[in-house]
Amino acid sequence: MNISLLMFLIFIAITLGITYWASRRSAGAAAYFAAGRQIKGWQNGIAVAGDYMSAASFLGIAGIIAFQGYDGFMFSVGWLVAYLTVLLVIAEPLRNTGKYTMADVLAYRLKPRPVRAMASLSTLTVSTFYMIAQMVGAGALVKLLLGNMVTYNEAVIAVGILMIVYVVFGGMLATTWVQIVKAVLLMAGTILLSILVMAHFHFSFGQFFGAISQVSYHDVKGTQVVRDFLQPGLRYKPPYGPLDLISLGMALIFGTAGLPHILVRFYTVPDAKTARHSVVWAMVLIGSFYIMTTFLGFGAATIVGPDYIKGHGGTNMSAPLLAQALAGNIFFAFISAIAFATILAVVAGLTISATTSFSHDFWTNVIHNGEERRAGEEVLVARISAFVVGGVAIGIAIVLGPTANVAFLVALAFAVAASANLPVIVLSIFWRRFNTAGAVTGLAVGLLASIGLILVSPSLMAIDPPTVVGTARHLIQAKAWFPLENPGILSIPLGFIGAIVGTLISSEPTAQEKFNELLVRSNTGLGAEKAAAH
């Protein structure tokens, strides 16, 4: 049997076992949506890290660094710094005021139906963007490993089915433990791969960085080029490159605090103190991991080479090909299985956040106006919606094809989260005057601005030469109207402006009256949701 397939099957068997165990403990909404709020701080911290260290991190960032050096490393810096926003601003108030979703915080003192409807739409949009990136990575990875045994489309469908199984049967508890197992494996594999890279250079940083400054590759004209990968400019070139880099940084740093699948993790712990504790655990793991992406990306550039990577799966396969070059096919299979585990864990987290938002926010509190529903209906709706969300993600990933860089796709999801979700969360918690009109306007403007600018950016809009065919061609064959690849530098301020203007042109005395209650609860935890009894 193909050793890669064997390792895949072993991991799938382990995770299905976890799902079966969790399914026996996921009775009731609190157990299904929030794991009974009984996850310990260190467990949730590892799970948060597992949720955050996605295919974009392991496959995408390594690939961008391998091809674009210093500019690619800026992705690592942005994702690393981002958790300071979560720790200092979001984690404690969110845990104290919410129940299952981001919209719970907004609905605490605002009119629930309009804010939940818009927040649910935003959650589904961000989750779908993020999920598509993971599915693209999964399809490309499995196709590379198993060769002619499966097609890219079949690989994407298989991952989608597994994702749906985890969520439908295991809920948040299964998702949490799949993420913990995956995070431990990913850290172990990344540490080992980093050590092997440095061993290749005799543990000499001088040799390592010397090799990086002399990376050789062929450009689009077929000319061999030697470039210093430690210098900026390979990706972000003048005149708009510096602005694009700032825009990327804004999206990554502020987007994390608006990612639905990260925010819902803080509802799985008993209290706000444990939520803060879990963020510290996550930051230690995430910080270590993103430092090591330097070794993975630059190691792939110097040891494997951009030309070889381009001809064997593209940028997303840089880390697995590095493992193969350093330690042969068995280690290649092991690292690829870890990458596969990474994808499965993250898509499960994304799906549970999307289905929870649809079921709890839209179905129960918008369609049925918060009326008491029969026991188990909310969970049943979430399980059914998992099939719909999974099907949409599978379809779009198949249309995009295996060549899209997953780190870049995820960066766009961060831009949408930072533009739509973060402004309304921050203003709801910290601004007394903030009201329902401001929340709805902020969410709508943030969503429309970020998605609209993405559609008319060079990411999707460009005139390709006739030699570029298939999925490599841009979606819209015209000159881009917006010069930056990432819209964050414009769409994030627009999200805040929309929320502020919407608030100032309307009045809602009840929202202001409930602000003191929200302030006390968000800072003290009085009245916060308690852990479920078992």
Residue spans of the language-model regions?
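Membrane-embedded helix-loop-helix hairpins and adjacent transmembrane boundary segments
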Residues: 1-534
